Structure formats: structure tokens, C-alpha cells
A protein has these predicted regions:
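Beta-propeller folds
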Residues: 3-189
């Protein structure tokens, strides 16, 4: 491909190599990148192009681009979304890929860790020690006045008549839950 750039004095010819189509069609290695509140760290979801059953949440120090923490998820599960809950802590939501569904679905499980990988633990869902069986959970809000907690909505879709959505105050360090309110009718959002 030949590109030309014109200036007021001369015309220059710039040559560029063709970019292979495979580069545009390939699955991305890094899918979602978010900067920490103090802009010290980057967190990103990483998908291994050689092993589609492996996904990671990776934290990098912006100053030297060294990896400071990794959270691994294997099999059909992966970290579908994550956010910086405060200056040091990241919360990730787990989703599952099932062959017969077009889109992955969230399992309701949440994992949290510090920027350095310390204090990594399941804080909500079936994987949490003594956790509840939920089929849906989503983050409603981070709480700037309470940096150790987030507000989530949770549902258990296994109930035949539908479920009551609960708003839960969730401690992002130990997974303690406190129900704030419950929807007055089933299947409310």
C-alpha cells in the first residue's frame, strides 16, 4: 500500500506494509483494562490465546509495567467484569460459558483481592465458604463513604414462582453480608 503525504514544498511517498487480516480477526488477549483510583496500577482481564479455558485478572504497576497480582479462573468460568472498589481492592464477577447459549451468564460468584494479590478470597456466591446459592448478582454501587463495602443486588432464580431481589451491603474484605432491603414483588429489578 502506498500512502502519499503532501506538504507545501514537496510530495513525499510513504510506504506501509499490509497488516494481515488475522490480526483483526483474532480474539483479543487483553479484553478490559481499568486504572486504579490513584492511577498507580492497571488491572486487565487476560485470555490465553493458546488455551481458551484459561482467563486471568492481572494487575500491573504503571511505573514499571511489572505484574503485581494474578487471579486465575479456569474451565468454563471467567471474570466477566471487574472494578476497583477502593484504592487497593479489586472485585471481579464470574460468568460461565455454556455451549448452547449465545452469551455467557453470571454465576453470582464474586472474588476480591488487593493490588498486590494479597487477601484474595471469594466474597459472594456459592464458592464463598458457607455462601448462598444465587444465580444472579450485580454491583449496584461502590460506596465512597464506606470504602470497605459495596452495594449489590442478588437473586436466586431457582425459586419456582420467581425470586425477590435483595439489596445487600457486602464487605469486600471478609464477605460479610447485611440485607438492606428486599423488593416488594417477585422478579423486580
Amino acid at each position: 500500500v502506498a500512502l502519499s503525504a503532501e506538504s507545501t514544498t514537496s510530495t513525499e511517498r510513504i510506504e506501509a506494509d499490509l497488516i494481515p487480516l488475522e490480526i483483526f480477526a483474532a480474539n483479543p488477549t487483553y479484553e478490559d483494562i481499568k486504572v486504579s483510583p490513584k492511577r498507580d496500577y492497571l488491572a486487565a482481564t487476560f485470555f490465553n490465546p493458546d488455551d481458551v479455558t484459561e482467563s486471568k485478572l492481572v494487575v500491573l504497576d504503571i511505573e514499571n509495567m511489572e505484574v503485581t497480582a494474578v487471579a486465575h479462573v479456569r474451565g468454563r468460568d471467567f471474570i466477566s467484569d471487574f472494578f476497583w472498589a477502593n484504592e487497593e481492592r479489586i472485585v471481579g464477577q464470574i460468568a460461565r460459558k455454556v455451549g448452547w447459549q449465545d452469551q455467557p451468564f453470571r454465576t453470582g460468584d464474586m472474588v476480591a483481592m488487593n493490588w498486590d494479590g494479597k487477601r484474595k478470597r471469594w466474597i459472594f456466591g456459592q464458592r464463598k465458604q458457607g455462601g448462598r446459592s444465587v444465580n444472579g448478582a450485580s454491583i449496584l454501587s461502590t460506596l465512597p463513604d464506606e470504602p470497605k463495602k459495596i452495594l449489590i443486588a442478588a437473586n436466586n432464580f431457582a425459586q419456582r414462582d420467581g425470586s425477590y431481589t435483595e439489596a445487600i451491603l457486602l464487605d469486600i474484605y471478609n464477605g460479610r453480608e447485611r440485607r438492606v432491603t428486599r423488593a416488594p414483588v417477585r422478579n423486580a429489578q
